[in-house]
């Protein structure tokens, strides 16, 4: 059974969902899971929102204006989510996969680097600043939380979005950090192009061989709606 669970992962496509119900659902999933619960990946876009990580400082939220600021329990500082950005949450039993937190972070960064390479974009990670960069510009943010040996939260990859709200914050706590996105580097690329590559690259790097793809929606309490 353990061998089968190590191979299996459920990939859920949420489309556009408000941040708070999805965050609640991640917490509920993690609190309720046991050693027989398959790992999951959640793909989602969020309406415009700033999320402040556990290490977040108020001075890095410069001019939020009409965009809400929501406290999150992920690692890191403030970032922005909006339509056209692919958020991928990774809900993984690290003990079962024999993965350390640093190994998971590296796998996520390498997933994004490999995905971008598929579109002829040369990207890299930085030891001093988590995430993925093209030159000096940041293209992907990441932040995780570990509970009961299981991960939740994940990455946010800029694909084809309005980047201007990033000017209202110091992204991830870095004043003057410039952001970029896939569609500025390779015109015409969409989430539909990048999302399958992102998921498949992650599955290959972490070693899942039996993905199951399920569309899913949530109610306002963060519970699954029937198909």
Curated annotation (Swiss-Prot):
The subcellular localization recorded is:
Cytoplasm
Q: Which GO terms describe its molecular function?
A: lipoyl(octanoyl) transferase activity
| Catalytic activity of the protein | octanoyl-[ACP] + L-lysyl-[protein] = N(6)-octanoyl-L-lysyl-[protein] + holo-[ACP] + H(+)
| Site keyed Lowers pKa of active site Cys: positions | 138
Q: Identify the keywords attached in UniProt to this record, alphabetized.
A: Acyltransferase, Cytoplasm, Transferase
The organism sits in which domain of life? Bacteria
The residues responsible for catalysis, as annotated, are: 172 (acyl-thioester intermediate)
Any single Gene Ontology cellular-component annotation: cytoplasm
Q: In which pathway does it act?
A: Protein modification; protein lipoylation via endogenous pathway; protein N(6)-(lipoyl)lysine from octanoyl-[acyl-carrier-protein]: step 1/2
Q: Please give the chief subcellular localization of this protein.
A: cytoplasm
Which ranges carry the BPL/LPL catalytic domain? 35-210
Q: What does this protein do?
A: Catalyzes the transfer of endogenously produced octanoic acid from octanoyl-acyl-carrier-protein onto the lipoyl domains of lipoate-dependent enzymes. Lipoyl-ACP can also act as a substrate although octanoyl-ACP is likely to be the physiological substrate.
Q: What else is known?
A: In the reaction, the free carboxyl group of octanoic acid is attached via an amide linkage to the epsilon-amino group of a specific lysine residue of lipoyl domains of lipoate-dependent enzymes.
What is the protein name for this chain? Answer: Octanoyltransferase
In the UniProt record, the gene name given for this protein reads: lipB
């Amino acid at each position: 059974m353990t061998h089968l669970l190590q191979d299996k992962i459920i990939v859920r496509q949420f489309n556009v969902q408000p941040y708070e119900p999805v965050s609640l659902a991640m917490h509920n999933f993690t609190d309720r899971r046991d050693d027989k619960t398959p790992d999951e990946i959640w793909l989602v876009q969020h309406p415009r929102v700033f999320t402040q990580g556990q290490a977040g400082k108020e001075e890095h939220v410069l001019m939020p204006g009409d965009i809400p600021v929501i406290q999150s329990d992920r690692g890191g500082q403030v970032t922005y989510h909006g339509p056209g950005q692919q958020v991928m949450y990774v809900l993984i039993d690290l003990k079962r996969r024999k993965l350390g937190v640093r190994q998971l972070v590296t796998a996520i960064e390498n997933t994004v680097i490999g995905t971008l390479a598929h579109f002829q974009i040369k990207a890299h990670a930085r030891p001093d600043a988590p995430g993925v960069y093209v030159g000096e510009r940041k293209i992907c943010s990441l932040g995780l939380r570990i509970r009961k040996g299981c991960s939740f939260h994940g990455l946010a990859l800029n694909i084809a979005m309005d980047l201007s709200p990033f000017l209202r914050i110091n992204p991830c706590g870095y004043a003057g950090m410039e952001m970029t996105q896939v569609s500025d580097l390779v015109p015409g690329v969409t989430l539909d192009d990048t999302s399958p590559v992102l998921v498949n690259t992650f599955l290959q790097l972490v070693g899942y061989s039996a993905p199951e793809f399920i569309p899913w929606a949530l109610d306002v309490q963060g519970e699954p709606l029937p198909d």
